[in-house]
Amino acid sequence: MDKGINQIINSYILCLQKENLKFTKVYLFGSYAKNKQSAHSDIDLAFIFDENKQIDYFDLQVQMLSLASYIDTRIEPHPMSSEDFTPENPLACEILNTG
């Protein structure tokens, strides 16, 4: 992966931490993780949260997308609870296989 993408991801993670978002894991997945990105690819990032029932994940994704726009509009955050992050979940399975 190129340094520029690493820098973008790290900047975004710092931005989220400054907003006091308490995720436990971050996964890069999708085309960038597979090194098959194009000029129009987004940067898929999965964020795993332990506060399973206390978070409205739709509102959280909206907040995370808003913050992403300040760093790089290609960032596509995917917040998930640790409870939902299992091999039985199709999105989690893809993240685990390609992330």
Where are the predicted features?
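Catalytic core of pol beta-like nucleotidyltransferases
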Residues: 1-25, 34-39, 50-99
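Glycine-rich beta-strand-to-loop/alpha-helix junction loops that act as flexible
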Residues: 29-31
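Short beta-strand->loop micro-motif that forms the acidic, two-metal-ion catalytic signature
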Residues: 44-48
